[in-house]
Structures are given as C-alpha cells and as structure tokens.
Amino acid sequence: MSTDVSGEPKVATVDMKLEVVTIPVSDVDRAKDFYLSLGWRLDADFAFGKDVRAVQVTPLHSGCSVTFGSGLTTAEPGSAQRLELVVEDIEVARDDLLDRGVKVSEVFHRDGGELLPGPDPERRSYLSYASFNDPDGNGWLLQEVTTRPPGRVWED
C-alpha cells in the first residue's frame, strides 16, 4: 500500500466507479433473454470477429452493468456467485421476479450468524435477502437496503 510522507496510507483521490461485472454463461442468447426478461436495459450486443460476442445489460437505475458473451472470460459458466442487487423492499422485489417467471427463494434474514425465514423483523437495512440463479447457475442475491449509514454515501 502506498503511503504519504508521514507514513499514513494515501486516501484515494481519483474518482473510480465500478462500471461492468462480467459473468460466465454457456448460451449467450439464452442469458440475454433471461436478463431482458428481468426488465434490464440492453446496452450493447456486438461481435468482435467470429469468436467474441459481448452483451451488456443494466438493472434499472444501476450504476454498474453486467456483461456476458463468448470469448470474454475463462471462468466456468455458473461460477459467479453472490452477485448482490440492492432493493428498497425485498418482498416487492421478490414478487416482481416471481411475476416474471423467475424461481426465487423465500425471503430470509440474518440474525447474528444464523439465517432465519422471513424479512428482518425490524426491517433493518442489509439484513433481509432472497436469492435466484440465472439459467447457468450464476447466483444473485437481493438485499434490502432502505437507509445507508454515514460513510456509505459519497459526499461531493
């Protein structure tokens, strides 16, 4: 880690944003159909020669997109796990996915290290979840966040 002249760690001063996460899939068209069925925006679908194809989709209002295709990664299809999507209401989000034909787990919450059924009784942020997989088994986790604590919101 780099330090300043006093030996303290340097604080990042360059604005960097996570733009894209690449997930491995076995069937590009099947994956594209699945993610579009979630209501995600299609940003790009193009080929580079005959061996590389890239599809980019973005969840509603997300600052980060998801890319998949052929020739993009050596990871095994289905090996991406715990890809987290933040939602304001876990039950509404789960119902929306069910209405779209997605197989979604029941809502569960964390109490200490234990996972229990249903949303967090106090509906505290970061503690209620539901999970689903894409057709290849890449694992997604819905996480309910209603309030971000200080330090988790960027100040300009």
Walk through the language-model features, giving the residues of each.
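Core segments of cupin and vicinal oxygen chelate
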Residues: 13-16, 22-65, 92, 99
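Helix-adjacent hinge/juxtasegments
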Residues: 69-93
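Short, solvent-exposed beta-strand edge segments and adjacent coil->beta transition regions
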Residues: 15-20, 78-82, 127
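Short hydrophobic-acidic sequence motifs that mark active-site Asp/Glu residues
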Residues: 17, 65-67, 139-141
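Residue-level signature for short turns and capping positions that connect secondary-structure elements
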Residues: 62, 71-73, 147
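Acidic di-acidic motifs
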Residues: 27, 89, 134
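Residue-level recognition of conserved beta-strand positions in structured domain cores
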Residues: 59, 68-70, 144
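Vicinal oxygen chelate
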Residues: 1-14, 46, 55, 85, ...
